C-alpha cells in the first residue's frame, strides 16, 4: 500500500497534512525510486465550515485534488449551494471553487484541482488551466439510479485511476462519473462477471461505457 500511485484521504484538514507528510516520509525510507503519488482529499462534512477555511487552504498545499460534494463546498463559505428548485447552483459552485484555488501559494497554484461531486448534476472540475462541468452518466436515464450509497467513493476511485492513467483531471473525472454510475445501479456492490475474457460489471464492459460517455460529453458539451 505504501508504494501505491494514489491515496484517497477522508479526514480533517490537519489530519490530511499529517497523513501526506507521514506517507512521503515512509516512502522515502523505503530507499526505492518511486514517482510522487497523487493525493486525493475528501474533507469530512462536519469540518466543511467557515471556521476551517484557513486550515482547508493549508491542507490544499499538500494534495493534488480536493473533492467535496456541492453541499460541503458551499458550507465552507456559508452560502446556499442549491437553487430554489433544488438543483445545484452552478454559479455558486464555480465561485466557491475559484475562491479555494485563489488561496494557494504561487508554487502550488498550477498543481491543485477542485473536483466537486454534484449528484444528479454530475461534477464540476476547476484548476488553474481548466474549468468544466461534466454530466452525470445516468442523467438521461434517472430510473437506472437505485441507491446512491457508495457513489461518491466509486467516483473517487475512478478519478484516481483516471488521473494515474491520463494525468488529466477532466478526463479523470469522466472515469469518476462512469465508476459512480455502476455503484448506484443497485443496492450493494455491482455484479462482476467475466464473459469471453472480458470483465463485465452489471453486464457492461467498463471501456464501452467510458467510450459512450466520452462521446456524449463531446456532443452535448458541458453545462
Stretches found by the model and what they are:
Residues 5, 21-25:
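A broadly conserved amphipathic alpha-helix scaffold signal in soluble, globular proteins
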Residues 9-10, 45, 148:
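Glycine- and other small-residue-rich loops at beta-strand/loop junctions that grip anionic moieties
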Residues 1-16:
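Conserved phosphate-binding/catalytic loop of the ribokinase/pfkB sugar-kinase fold
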Residues 110, 139-223:
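Conserved post-catalytic alpha-helical subdomain immediately downstream of the catalytic base
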Residues 24-38, 43-133:
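Conserved phosphate/ATP/ADP-binding segment of small-molecule kinases
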Residues 14-19, 47-51:
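Short, charged/polar "capping" segments at the starts of alpha-helices
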Residues 13, 70-71, 153:
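Alpha-helix N-cap/helix-start capping motif
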Residues 130-142:
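Glycine/charged-rich beta-loop-alpha catalytic/anionic-binding loops adjacent to active sites
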